[in-house]
Amino acid sequence: MYKRQDETGTISSLASADYVKLAHDAGREVWGLIDNFNEAFDETTDLAYASVRSRIIEQLLAEAASCGMDGINVDFENLKEAGIPHYLQFLRELTSAAHAQNLVVSVDTPVPQAYTMYYQRGEQARFVDYMIVMAYDEHFAGSEEAGSVSSLPFVQQAVEEMTRVMPADQVICGIPFYTRVWTEKFGQSAITSEVLGMDGAKNYAKENQMTETWDASLGQNVATVETSDARYTIWMEDEQSMEEKLKVIQSADLAGVAEWKLGFERADVWSLISEYIETNS
């Protein structure tokens, strides 16, 4: 993983050649990830200068060569519209240089919505190798209403929209290993939520004697309970919801599936994912 350190393009690295070797020995490829989660990062200025873009790219490719990685994944999120031209130019330059070293370039992107159309995904698709659509955060911490993190219709929309701009065999669908427990206080308009992993959600539902029912329209179990002052709801992510999402991904013949994030999953989910990968390969 790589992170921006300063405005000159210097990045910090957590890359490990030992980790890459372990992955390769297990028959896995490794794509080094660079993100923009540093609060000081601003693509409208950080990527506006050729010298800064060049410095970032040089470091990424040097690290990739040193560790023996197979590709680079760009996870720049919440981009401003004014910064998109600079972001696109960064991707063009990175992809050109990476391909010269036989490296794959993938980018992460939110589900296409009216308010993110300025991302110009069609233009990105002209040069990157893969696009990973993050089919989660349908409802998030700041949402005005409680709801699923990743309902089946939301995943279907993500797949349909992405395959309009990029061939299916270059699209990877990201699905969540997490959910949220939503609290709606009676008599109050504000709602709150807390992130839970798969086991955490199951345990919370059991401990609070929540009633769990399957919602076929959402492809999820929904757990609810009411107390004297509030309603608590969890749109569960479990083996059943994962399987419904994997069916969509498989049916669309996508390149693969990604997950966010490790440590939130139930152990049984991996057998489902492995079954999908083997069937789709």
Language model segments and positions:
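Conserved, mostly hydrophobic/aromatic
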Residues: 74, 131, 173, 249, ...
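Conserved small/polar residues in nucleotide/adenosyl-binding loops
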Residues: 1-5
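Glycan-binding loop/region signatures in secreted carbohydrate-active enzymes
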Residues: 177-245, 277-281
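Short, acidic/polar
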Residues: 46-65, 113-122, 237-250
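Acidic/aromatic/glycine-rich contiguous surface patches that form carbohydrate-binding/processing clefts
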Residues: 245-281
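Substrate-binding surface in catalytic domains of secreted glycosidases
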Residues: 7-14, 58, 81-205
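Substrate-binding cleft of extracellular glycoside hydrolase catalytic domains
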Residues: 19-72, 76-77, 100
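Short acidic, glycine/proline-enriched helix-loop-strand junctions
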Residues: 13, 18, 25-27, 83-85, ...
